[in-house]
A protein has these predicted regions:
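Long, low-complexity segments enriched in small/aliphatic residues
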Residues: 1-58
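Long, contiguous, secondary-structure-rich segments that constitute the structural scaffold
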Residues: 49, 53-69, 73-212
Length: 212
């Protein structure tokens, strides 16, 4: 049975009601400790947590990693550079993502897509950072305005691996996996970052990559 198929609502006379409310301040405003507003949202080619769209190589090619979009002035003040890693912190958790500079982003606000999970990223779960405050009437969460801060993540090396089978290398400071096409067959692209010295990189490469 389809909900509201007959046009009625859960009111005494089955008619819809408009509820007038007074515009309220944010339940958790920004502060010196949490100076940014985290605005989670969607990107063009993915749906929710990518349980279906994430299986498509074509849809995964457009944007392959979780990221935080930030105004260049904010990035300069925070010591963030395009393409490097940043950690988004809120009172509820942290996420490590790529930095994307955009003058279209409002200063003081950062955007981050919520599609990535522990299945395809090391620490890209943006939804885990959002507070659980909801509107008392509609139940709608105040998910577009969680106070946050963004700090640089220092690593020694960036790279990526292409593989026809899923990879889970050890000792990575960051990783994000996406589907990819290799000729007529599919596989995965693993974007990664390490924080190791030269000897550590050599040992990691020997343990991770096939000989030859």
């Amino acid at each position: 049975e389809r909900l509201f198929a007959e046009g009625g609502f859960f009111t005494p006379d089955t008619r819809a009601r408009f509820v007038a409310t007074t515009l309220a301040r944010l339940a958790s405003p920004v502060s010196p400790e949490w100076p940014c507003v985290l605005n989670p949202g969607r990107i063009r080619d993915q749906w929710h947590t990518m349980t279906r769209t994430g299986l498509s190589c074509r849809l995964s090619t457009h944007i392959q990693e979780p990221y935080v979009e930030i105004h260049p002035d904010d990035a300069s003040r925070l010591g963030l550079e395009q393409g490097t890693l940043a950690r988004i912190e809120t009172p509820h958790g942290t996420a490590s993502v790529r930095v994307l500079l955009s003058r279209g982003q409002q200063p003081g606000s950062v955007f981050a897509p919520f599609h990535w999970s522990a299945q395809n990223s090391s620490a890209g779960r943006i939804s885990a950072l959002v507070h659980g405050i909801t509107d008392p009437i509609s139940g709608q969460p105040e998910s577009k305005a969680t106070p946050a801060r963004v700090v640089p993540v220092r690593v020694s090396h960036y790279g990526f691996l292409l593989s026809r089978s899923p990879l889970r290398p050890q000792r990575l400071a960051y990783w994000a996996e996406s589907r990819a096409m290799f000729g007529t067959s599919s596989g995965t692209t693993l974007h990664l970052a390490l924080d190791l010295d030269a000897a550590g990189i050599a040992a990691w490469r020997h343990a991770t990559l096939p000989a030859g």
